[in-house]
């Protein structure tokens, strides 16, 4: 792990996915499992303290960015304002910005993580407790083959075309579908396509929606399976 001290208030970390795995974590759980991500974070902070006497004596402002080979974490010491209603963040010599606590610092950080995961993996998290996956197919014949292989219920699926590729968006309700079932369905889908790095928001906005609902069932009913 690389540690760089930006100034008296800020430290910058870069840790590779290989290093993360060597520490007993995996790249998925640091985004999805809050307890494990906090465990990794405090392990990093302990090293920062030993490395450069970066002691924590108050609230922190944390920015996380995913890059190709790992993650970058920027940690800035903050202070509560005298009235206790704002966080004061130093951004330069004699410069401070105020962030109202009622904006929900924790929710802002969590939303940044969610947006970063969506951008990196094509996974979409929704406020209603559902989450979706966007799968890319290079050939429509692969979508046809999948439609005859996989039959499911209570799962939202849509079909899009974008930049000469086809995309199937599937959305799961974690109340109706357990992790084992979701993994089974995704493993079958990924035999025919690959997880997209695009988000459903981009594909739905700039691409063309071919089938709005029951996409695989519609394809199965209109295109015979290849023998």
From Swiss-Prot:
It comes from the Bacteria. GO terms for biological process: establishment of competence for transformation; negative regulation of establishment of competence for transformation; negative regulation of sporulation resulting in formation of a cellular spore; sporulation resulting in formation of a cellular spore. One of its GO terms (molecular function) is protein-macromolecule adaptor activity. Pfam families: MecA. The keyword Endoplasmic reticulum does not apply. The keyword Electron transport does not apply. Homodimer. This is Adapter protein MecA 1. It comes from Bacillus cereus (strain ATCC 14579 / DSM 31 / CCUG 7414 / JCM 2152 / NBRC 15305 / NCIMB 9373 / NCTC 2599 / NRRL B-3711). The gene is mecA1.
């Amino acid at each position: 792990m690389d540690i760089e001290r930006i100034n008296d208030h800020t430290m910058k970390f870069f840790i590779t996915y290989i290093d993360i795995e060597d520490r007993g974590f995996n790249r998925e759980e640091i985004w999805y499992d809050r307890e494990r991500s906090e465990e990794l974070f405090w392990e990093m902070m302990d090293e920062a303290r030993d490395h450069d006497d970066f002691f924590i004596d108050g609230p922190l402002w944390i920015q996380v960015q995913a890059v190709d080979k790992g993650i970058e974490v920027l940690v800035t010491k903050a202070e509560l304002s005298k009235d206790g209603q704002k966080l004061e963040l130093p951004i330069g010599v004699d410069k401070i910005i105020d962030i109202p606590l009622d904006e929900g610092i924790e929710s802002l950080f969590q939303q940044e993580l969610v947006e970063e995961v969506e951008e990196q993996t094509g996974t979409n998290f929704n406020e209603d407790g559902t989450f979706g996956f966007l799968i890319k197919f290079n050939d429509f014949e692969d979508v046809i083959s999948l439609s005859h292989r996989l039959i499911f219920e209570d799962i939202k699926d849509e079909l899009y075309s974008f930049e000469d590729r086809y995309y199937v968006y599937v959305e799961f309700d974690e109340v109706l579908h357990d992790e084992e079932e979701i993994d089974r369905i995704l493993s079958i889908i990924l035999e025919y396509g690959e997880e997209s790095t695009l988000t459903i928001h981009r594909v739905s906005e700039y691409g063309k929606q071919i089938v709005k609902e029951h996409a695989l069932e519609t394809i199965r009913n209109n295109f015979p399976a290849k023998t």
